[in-house]
Amino acid sequence: MTDSANPTPSARPPRQPRTGTTGTGARKAGSKSGRSRAREFALQALYQHLVGGNDATAIDVFTRDLSGFHKADAAHYDALLHGCITTAQYMDELIAPQLDRKMSEISPIEHAVMWIGVYEFQHCQDVPWRVVINECIELAKEFGGTDGHKYVNGVLNGLAPQLRATEVAADKAAARG
């Protein structure tokens, strides 16, 4: 038996916490970019739209009054909120073939996160496709169900070659060497 005050030499050192993250691995609020914050507020607004059927203008007014909105990239938030609501049916048609269940069975959080991912794939060409997926995974980890981030990852990885074909192909070619 080993003494806890004198561990054996082979004992592993205590795990060091990742700085700038929460217990779930999500980034802490202080280390988030304006665009990351915009995605969070857009997610909350899109959730209101999906669950309550609220009008985009009413949601927008409510969301802009939330604490911390001033730190978000307002232009990116506007693009996500209004763009996702305007193109929701089209985005659902893109997402549906990637699903293993009916859209109505998808959590509204994961649904909204997938909308954000699809919208950014199509309209935010300055954001690399892997960053889009990573940001959406982080949103799903922070706000979604236990394994929702895995589902979001699978769906967006399935859509990336379709929506960002050139960029994905170039990344895969570079990885092969």
Curated annotation (Swiss-Prot):
UniProt source species: Acidovorax ebreus (strain TPSY) (Diaphorobacter sp. (strain TPSY))
Family assignment from sequence similarity: Belongs to the NusB family.
Physiological role: Involved in transcription antitermination. Required for transcription of ribosomal RNA (rRNA) genes. Binds specifically to the boxA antiterminator sequence of the ribosomal RNA (rrn) operons.
GO molecular function, one term: RNA binding
UniProt name for this protein: Transcription antitermination protein NusB
PANTHER family: ANTITERMINATION NUSB DOMAIN-CONTAINING PROTEIN, N UTILIZATION SUBSTANCE PROTEIN B-RELATED
Record-level GO BP terms: DNA-templated transcription termination; transcription antitermination
InterPro entries: NusB-like_sf, NusB_fam, NusB_RsmB_TIM44
